Structures are given as C-alpha cells and as structure tokens.
Amino acid sequence: METSSSRSVQVDDWQKNYSVVASSICTPKQKADAYRALLLHIQDAYANSEISQVFATNLFKRYTEKYSAIIDSDNVVTGLNNYAESIFALAGSQQADSDKWQSGLSINNVFKMSTVQEMMQAGQKFKESLLEPADASVVMCKEPTIFEVPQLGVCGGSEEADLLSSSVHGTEKTQAIPGNSLRCSPFQSTLFPMATNTKTCLTSSAPSGESTTATFHRTPLFGNTKKEPQSFPKTSTGLNMFLSNPSCVPSGCENPRERKAFNDSDTINMLSNPTLNKAPSKTEDSGQREDNSLPTFKTAKEQLWADQKKRSHQSQHTSKSFNGAIKKSLGAGRSRGIFGKFVPPVSNKQDGSEQNGNVKPKSSRAGSAEPAHLTDDRLKNVEPRMVELIMNEIMDHGPPVHWEDIAGVEFAKATIKEIVVWPMMRPDIFTGLRGPPKGILLFGPPGTGKTLIGKCIASQSGATFFSISASSLTSKWVGEGEKMVRALFAVARCQQPAVIFIDEIDSLLSQRGDGEHESSRRIKTEFLVQLDGATTSSEDRILVVGATNRPQEIDEAARRRLVKRLYIPLPEASARKQIVVNLMSKEQCCLTDEETELVVQQSDGFSGADMTQLCREASLGPIRSLHTADIATISPDQVRPIAYIDFENAFRTVRPSVSPKDLELYENWNKTFGCGK
C-alpha cells in the first residue's frame, strides 16, 4: 500500500514538472528547476530497477541536453543567468564600499592617450597645409623650446622688443626670434583673424616690483612635450603664456571690439588644440614643480585623513572668531607645566559651547522633547554628554508590549496593575497612602517573563522606559559612575512618569562587604540615595523595577527600598498551553486538542523559554524527515505540517532549565521576603 502511494506521488510530480517544461509561460528558472527534478526522478527510477539502463540513458541524455540549452544560452529571454543574481546580491551588500573613491580618468588623461594625440597631430597637419609658404615665418621644431625673456619693455610706436636666444634642450642649435616676430605676423593673423594691427606687441602682465618667472612655453605642432631644466635666474618682469592667459592681449588692441575678437579667437584656438590650454607652473626657489602625472588613487582611509585636515582648518578659523579665545586641546598641544589646567581625556561637548554661554548637544532619538528637557533647572548640574548618552543608549524605544503577550502569572499581573499602572494613569486619584511604590523586585527562575513584565509596565502606563545594566553605569574614570547614576535619575524626573528597569539587579546592588571595590560601593550608595533618600520627593513618579534570578544576593538596603517583591513562578498548565497554541498558530500544524494536552502534560517543569525552545525544535521535525536530495528541489508547500511525533522527538533533546532544588530556594525566599501568595 505504501509502495503504490509513493508511486502515485512520483507520477504526480513527473506530470507536474513535465507540464512546466512544456508550458510557454513559465520562466527559464522554473523550467531549469523542473528539468533538475525530472533528472532526479530518472535516477531514482533506475536505482529502484523500475526502468532499464538503455531507457534511463536515453531519457537522461535527452533532458540533460534540454537543461544545458537553458543554462548555457546567452539569450536573456530564453536563457538562465545563474551567476549575475547571486553576484549582484553579494556586491550590493558589501559594507566596505566607499563613496570617497575617485576615478583616475580625467580630461587631461584623455588628451594624453595615443589615439587622441594622433587625431590632434592630424588636425595640426591639415591646419599647416592651409598656410601659405610665405606666411610660415614661425620656426617650428620637433622638440618644444622654452625661451627666456630677461627683459621685456613696453612697445609703442617704433620701439621693438628684442628677445634673447635661449638654449634648446639637447644638442640642437640656438634659434633667435627677431623682434618683429612678436608682432601680428601672418601666421598670427591666421590664428587670430581680428588682431591685424601691426603696431601690437606683447606686454608684461606682471605688476612692477613683483618677481615672477620669465619663461615662455611654446607648444609645437609635432612631437612630444618636454621642458627645459628650470635653472634660469629670476628676472624682474615675467611673460605669461600667450595662448592660455586671456589677459595677455596685444597692447595695440585698445578698441573694445578688437579686444573681444582677440579673446574669442583665443578661446577657439584653445578648443581646437587642448594642449595649449595648460598654464606653466611657477618656479620656486626650491625648484619644485607641479606634478602633471596621472592622479593617484585615494583610499577611503586617505580621504578620511584629508577630510579631518579640512575640518581641523575650519575649526581653527572658527575658534579665532570667538574673541581670541583658546580652545582646550589634548596631547602635545596642551600645557605641561605644573600650573597648566588639566583637560580630562573624556570628550566634553560643553567645552565648545561654554564660550557662547549655552549648551547645544547633538540631537537624539528622543525627538523634539529633548531641547525642552535640556533647559530644565534639574539638568543644570548634569553634563550634556551624559544626558545624550542616556537619551540615545539607555532609553528604550522598542515596540509596545501588552498583557496578553505574557502567558500565566495572573497574580503578578493583577498586583502590578493595581499598584503601578493605575496610579501612573490616574495620579489625581492615587495620592497619599494610595501612591505607587518606589521600587518593585521581580524574582524567580530564568525564562518566566520578568523582562516582558517590565516593558509591559512602561507600555501600558505610558511611561518612559529606561533599561540599564551594571555595565552601562560603570566607568574606568573615577567618579564617572556616580555621575551617570545621578544623571539617569535627573533625566527620569524630567521624563515623568518613568520606569527604570534593571535586569540582573543582583550584579548592581549586591551585598556590600569589606573586600568590595571603592568605585562599586560609591555607585551603590548613590543609587540607593537617588532611589529613596533625603533629596527625593514623594511626588516623583519614578518606578524602579528590578529583575533577578538570585534574590538572596541583593543588599539589605536595596531590598528595603524595593517594597513590592513579587515571585514570578514557572508557567502552569494553562500558561504552557497558551504558549504552544500561540506559537503553533504561526506555523503549519496538525495537532489536535488531545495531542496538545499531552504536550502540556509532558512539559511539566518547563519555563516559558523552555517551551519556546521545545516548539522550535519540533518545527524542525518535518525538515529532518526529508532526504538531502529532496531539500534542493522541494517547494515550501510540499513540506508536511508539524505533527505530534515531532514533539515526541523534541522531548528527547529539550530538558527543563530549572531544577527542583532551585524552585525550593525561590519558594523559601518568597515565604520570607516576598509579597505574593
């Protein structure tokens, strides 16, 4: 009977996959999955001797070729891209990618490419062929020549400017340029058609008395660009590059129209030959030059250093505007004398704002209510950085918790509603002796919902919830722990009503002894004083809720201040059933009421966390019943629902986390100090 049912399932799967393959509306991914399933069925049938070897070989070859046609196809519509999806998913989730990386490709690099250089040279050859032989009065050479201009006078009328000959790099002969070549020659008139005045000449653009470099870079029409060694002496006047500086217009072009035409022709020539649009760098005494090489690659770390330098320069400029005030600094910049003021290593956000007389900490998740609390008189003696730390890290902004989310512990929930939630919701009714207590202690075995009760108190009463631990209040600096405790209660008074939840309170308020460290003793003393001391007010609506698994280790003074001490026992049968029903309602489960009762009976002594682990282990039963080959091809709908046999297998691996000896200890402590039944 079982064999016939398995064969019918295989036939149904074969027909389903074959219909997917024959369909024209299915995606290549679905077809590839169907082909893989068919190949697996062929292998299983041959392994069970249901088909012959020849028939299995022919079928396997046929479907393998069809499967390969989909996998190896380059067509986007009919093929399956089995690499790009996973690669894009991995590349999209990389955290090390930085938007600070810069590309090494720029416009100057494009002009340095060999193909672009060939195109520019071809254009120059065509431009040269258009010139008449008589107009080619400018000497052209294969290598560029840098001419030194030691003296350049102002030309006017019959005066001419003589240029000294300059040495050419290498073994080439010196070439002299006559004075009239600086005037508007026919070659220059070709480049600048509107500048035809024969009386124009170049003038120095440098003001009198300013020392500049008198070098003239002439870019050739052919050949590579080279420079002469910059070992020439400085002169009193300088000549900027003729084609790259728009201010170097002929002195004779005093007409605005001629000057405009000269600038327009200069721009056109620079666009036609981009290599002429590079101004030479100024020569310094040290002989340093401007680096024209390819831009170097900057990593995210180098870019971060550059940004930090920019911010430091900006902060220096900003600090100078504060009436010459000196900003506090750490490290080598501070005074090391015996009379120097000590600057604490902990960053104080108030230092930068003391000069202006106000405090401006960063905005936190508390929203728009934070500025109103920072101006409160109760926070005037609290450091702003501690207020910011409490608002950002200690204040809890999690989802709300309802009483229905907590299974069992009906007595504890009713007591908490009576003495905590209702007084916080209606403080006008619960006054005087009806006022809420200052502290509540929730003790019991682990995994019974003590933390959920603390969150539910804050959610249902509309109070601000502070979740702290011993690590959030301790510090390696002397006196910082007490300040943090004082700041915590100061912020809580500004955020009334407030609930301060301390998980594992025995680690923070343990019994004080002779061998205890001084810093931990001061933190405990400050906490007890803030909880119920001479400076506290009876009108403060601040509730301290502590949860612990070891109530016998709490200090006597802390136990006295935690007035209501409620025992949170293990969940009863009804509570365990509620946990199982709630968890199984989110999964595919076929448990009957009788089977659920059996699970509840067998889970006697389990905590709430143990019941959750039991259900999680049972939910893995249907997955474990599958074969390894079926996991790769099976769909989620084909996974069978959770059955009672899965819970039976889960009971073999999941054990209760609380021993009867521990339960006896909790019950004895509850009889001695507890406030429950």
From Swiss-Prot:
Location in the cell: Nucleus; Cytoplasm; Cytoplasm, Perinuclear region
Keyword Ribonucleoprotein: no
Subunit structure: Hexamer. Interacts (via N-terminal one-half region) with RAD51; the interaction is direct. Interacts (via N-terminal one-half region) with SPIDR (via the C-terminal region); the interaction is direct. Interacts with FIRRM; may regulate homologous recombination.
Cross-link (Glycyl lysine isopeptide (Lys-Gly) (interchain with G-Cter in SUMO2)): K226
Polar residues biased stretches: 203-216, 264-280, 347-358
Superkingdom in the source lineage: Eukaryota
Stimuli inducing this protein: By E2F1 and serum stimulation.
EC numbers on record: 3.6.4.-
Binding residues for ATP: A407, G447, T448, G449, K450, T451, L452
Domain notes: The N-terminus is necessary for its recruitment to DNA damage sites.
Protein's organism: Rattus norvegicus (Rat)
GO BP of this protein: ATP metabolic process; cellular response to ionizing radiation; male meiotic nuclear division; negative regulation of apoptotic process; negative regulation of intrinsic apoptotic signaling pathway; osteoblast differentiation; osteoblast proliferation; regulation of cell cycle
Membrane as UniProt keyword: no
Function: Involved in DNA double-strand break (DBS) repair via homologous recombination (HR). Recruited at DSB sites independently of BRCA2, RAD51 and RAD51 paralogs in a H2AX-dependent manner. May regulate osteoblast proliferation and differentiation. May play a role in the control of male meiosis dynamic.
An MF annotation (GO) of this entry: ATP binding
Name of the protein this chain belongs to: Fidgetin-like protein 1
UniProt modified residues of type N6-acetyllysine: K341
Pfam family of the protein (one): AAA
Reaction equations catalysed: ATP + H2O = ADP + phosphate + H(+)
Chief location: nucleus
Entry GO terms, CC: cytoplasm; nuclear chromosome; nucleus; perinuclear region of cytoplasm
Top-level EC class as recorded in UniProt: hydrolase
